[in-house]
Amino acid sequence: MSTPLTLDNARRPDGTRVLSVVGEIDMSNSGELAAAVEAELAQTGGSVLLDLTRVEYLDSAGLYVLLLHAERIEILATPLIAPVLVLSGLPELTAVHGLE
């Protein structure tokens, strides 16, 4: 059974593509996240901002998706998932905002 995950995309006035993620990211839905990130990246020649401020849980399958695309994404996080992102080394590979 897949864990519920909501993905919404938008474009900011400055042209930045934003993919907002709501729910829990785990093995059951990480493929859905990967497909959404890849679709957003295909729409832009630049990077995509992943808004993870409403993510309540992130496991290693979700981290894998983030690490796989680290060169072309930026992440907006919250203190809830910040420790996982820091331990994975992700802030050394891409911009991660909201680690405070």
Report each predicted region and the residues it spans.
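Short, charged, intrinsically disordered terminal tails
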Residues: 2-6, 86-100
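Amphipathic alpha-helical interaction surfaces in cytosolic regulatory modules
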Residues: 27-94
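STAS-typified acidic loop motif
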Residues: 1-35
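Intrinsically disordered, low-complexity regions
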Residues: 16, 24, 46-47, 99
